[in-house]
Amino acid sequence: MNKKNEKILYLPNPRGFCAGVERAINIVELSLEKYGPPIYVRHEIVHNPWVVKDLEKKGVIFVDELSDIPDGERVIFSAHGVSSEVKSEANSKKMDFTDATCPLVLKVHFEAKRHFDNGLHIFLIGHKGHPEVDGTMGQIPKNSITLLENEDDINKINERKYDKVALITQTTLSVDDTARLINLLKKKFPNITEPPREDICYATTNRQMAVKSIAKKCDAI
């Protein structure tokens, strides 16, 4: 509070959409301009109801699965990414699809496939049911990747079951929470293969740092 008892609102910077989301929205907008409505999008292009409603008014139809779309239609995959199975289904239904997956999510996909090709079992730190996690896990056979959500999941791992292992993460996680899980996992597997650069994207990291920087002078967030 200041002397006049007025509330002060601090806005973190940076804030708002990341480059990957803006790219995905732009792909949808350009598709509308080029082909006209309807344009189908598998899952919400971004978790923002205002953006979704605005695009719906322009003729975008958001669906949960490809089975909700007539064969042969145009469809866009959201920034969160999709499994290899979804792309195969789109091809079998003769759909003209555009992949708007964030390039930083694709980086994690490539890591998963490379580790699998090299014979490593993969541990993915992320949230069960999140579209990005579903897409990443769907890049390789199910028995080659294990999802870890918390410390209990890591404590339950039988390290003697695995020879060579690798670590990847969801791109949109708490930096601090993920660091704790990684350290715990490295105690079990000192030689675990880590990403050359962390998988949590720079936009996620920057925005968390921005909130931390103003939190010290705020009474409430």
Predicted regions: what they are:
Residues M1-I221:
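The feature marks the mature, well-folded catalytic cores of soluble enzymes
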